[in-house]
Amino acid sequence: QLMSDFSPPRVSTSFERKVGASLCKASELAMSDKLPKFRLVSAPTGGSKTTSSIALLAMLANEDKGFTGAYICKTIEECEYVYRQLKRLVDPSVLAVYTSLHKHEASPTKLLEKKKELGLEIHDHFDAQDLFSSRLIITTHSRWKKEYDDEVDLGVRKYKGNQRNLFIIDEEPELFSIFP
């Protein structure tokens, strides 16, 4: 279903299928009882990491009603893209996206700026509390990192008080900075 979004629609390449298989295996290992819990899938830009990740989350959420996951993006634009794709593949009631532009009190000025600058139109808005009660969430690196830095529960790592089953962190997050 995701492949039909391309213009013209196309089938996945052998390389993209291998990336998808690697992502599935890494996710399986990350969710298993084996340590370490972190797995990395590296592929060049356009290698289908994002598309495979979206498809995997959708499949897991649709097949296992107890599955919970978080997709962590670098930018608001990426969050909106992932949200739109997942919204087509899963029951929207299990899904929430939360960024400064997805919250109900988002600045109309900022929304207009992003529309003019990037053609980004955000129509669905959520409360921060929606992260705690949604099986699948999408948010930014900064919110995910804030949970660790401030030692607070912002609904990213946990669903209804329990650790989420799977976290997909798209792109390399800046986990620390070095200042001169």
Where are these regions (language model features)?
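Pre-P-loop entry segment of helicase/translocase ATPase cores
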Residues: 1-33
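Walker A/P-loop
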Residues: 34-55
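Signature of the SF2 helicase/ATPase Hel1-core->accessory helical subdomain module
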Residues: 141-180
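Conserved Walker A/P-loop ATP-binding site and its immediately adjacent core
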Residues: 50-52, 59, 66-90, 94-104, ...
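Structural motif
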Residues: 43-45, 74-76, 139-143, 171-172
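Conserved catalytic network of the ASCE P-loop NTPase/AAA+ motor domain
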Residues: 62-64, 128-131, 158-161
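Loop/turn-to-beta-strand initiation segments
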Residues: 68, 133-137, 163-166
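Inter-Walker segment of RecA-like/P-loop motor cores
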Residues: 90-148
